Amino acid sequence: MTDITIYHNPACGTSRNTLALIRNSGIEPAIILYLETPPNREQLKALISAMGIDARALLRKNVEPYEKLGLAEERFSDEQLIEAMLNYPILINRPIVVSPLGTRLCRPSEAVLDILPDAQQGEFRKEDGEKVIDKHGNRIV
């Protein structure tokens, strides 16, 4: 049983890199494919609260529903933005990782390192070749 959960989109490079960093620490997380199984209202509100952000900070802006619904306008309340994310899960930014050390929107993917309970177990390179963990498991800054 795992204490780490990732809200994951396998089509997203940042999400894939985040999952790989979790696995590089020796943890197999619970994986929620959030586009197939989106969070319900209570879960989404709890995630937003746990991250200490407002709904707008979780909103993806480079997807069609964002423009179509005019979500760039500041007139929308958090409740209205949450409703939009529930109706169009593609609007939920990702990956979101929940761990005993916190909940984060892991953009960039290295943000997950701050909430992993276990150290990295060796070198890690992102899909684009960028080295973020050295062969000793230490973060490269």
Positions of predicted regions on the chain:
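Structural alpha/beta surface segment adjacent to cysteine/selenocysteine redox centers
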Residues: 5-10, 14-75
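Non-globular targeting/processing and membrane-anchoring segments
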Residues: 2, 86-93, 98-141
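Low-complexity, compositionally biased segments
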Residues: 12, 65, 81, 131, ...
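Glycine-rich loops and low-complexity Gly/Arg-rich segments
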Residues: 30-32, 53-58, 82-84, 121-124, ...
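Thioredoxin-like thiol-disulfide oxidoreductase module
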Residues: 66, 74-89
